[in-house]
């Protein structure tokens, strides 16, 4: 079971952290969760890492779980990246000398790719796991609606709308559990958070949101389920292809028939094969 801690104190409150501790770990994994969820939802995944002597940390992003901000307001992106940096620094202080991997799922995958690409922060990890990243959506937002959201991001950035996440298309019901009944989970996203995600996703895909070359040699694995009905698998295919073609150390794995939460599988899988792949990938670094 995890223990909670105060990762970072800011003017409005705190950023909550989670720790799945093991003594003298071989490696450390830091998790960035997706929209509407919270760090503790990765308990099942973290325990599998722990079994292989890998310590795990996570955070509640702004607007999520026990952290500050209105529900769904995971913005501005600059501050979100600073929170991720704080998580990595906490891991370094807790486990000095250990190799650290940054693992982001869904919106967390978008944020983690942004962190990888930005070149703005010097504390890069030794590897990246990108799970079903928000690069583009399966159902694109209509242009008139997106224009309105962009306007609201400027004049009322904390205004929220429904993220419309249906628990039935996330993964296996036995592992997803009663998603809508969990009080730590919500279905809100703010205008600024949405625009940040869409704009950065497009830039990551076409290369306009590019890095300064420092990330090219850092091992990165991008994984996506072919049956994802939330974040389009095509976005992952395209960004992986682009990065491989320019010589980055990127591996792409597509899981046939798995849903959005690939670590939770689909109706006939609990995602154990995905978790095993991640564990072995981290161990091999």
Feature names for model-found ranges:
Residues 36-38, 65-95, 268-274:
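Catalytic nucleophile-loop/oxyanion-hole region of alpha/beta-hydrolase
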Residues 251-285:
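Catalytic active-site module of serine/aspartate enzymes centered on a nucleophile-bearing elbow/loop
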């Amino acid at each position: 079971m995890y223990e909670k801690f105060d990762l970072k104190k800011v003017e409005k409150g705190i950023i909550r952290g989670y720790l799945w501790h093991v003594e003298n770990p071989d490696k450390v994994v830091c998790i960035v969760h997706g929209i509407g969820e919270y760090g503790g939802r990765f308990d099942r995944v973290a325990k599998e890492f722990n079994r292989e002597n890998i310590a795990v940390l996570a955070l509640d992003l702004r607007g999520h779980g026990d952290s500050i901000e209105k529900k769904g307001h995971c913005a501005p992106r600059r501050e979100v990246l600073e929170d991720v940096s704080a998580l990595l620094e906490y891991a370094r202080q807790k486990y000095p000398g250990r190799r650290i991997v940054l693992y982001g799922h869904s919106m967390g995958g978008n944020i983690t790719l942004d962190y990888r690409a930005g070149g703005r922060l010097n504390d890069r990890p030794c590897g990246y796991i990108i799970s079903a990243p928000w690069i583009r959506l399966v159902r694109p937002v209509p242009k008139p609606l997106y224009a309105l959201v962009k306007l609201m991001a400027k004049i009322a950035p904390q205004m929220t709308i429904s993220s419309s996440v249906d628990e039935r298309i996330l993964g296996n019901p036995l592992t997803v559990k009663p998603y809508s009944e969990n009080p730590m989970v919500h279905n809100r996203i703010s205008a600024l958070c949405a625009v940040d995600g869409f704009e950065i996703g497009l830039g990551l895909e076409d290369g306009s949101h590019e890095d300064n070359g420092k990330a090219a040699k850092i091992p990165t694995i991008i994984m996506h389920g072919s049956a994802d009905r939330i974040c389009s698998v095509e976005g992952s295919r395209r960004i992986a292809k682009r990065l491989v073609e320019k010589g980055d150390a990127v591996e792409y794995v597509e899981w046939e028939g798995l849903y959005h939460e690939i670590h939770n599988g689909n109706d006939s899988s609990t995602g154990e094969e995905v978790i095993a792949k991640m564990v072995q990938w981290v161990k091999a670094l």
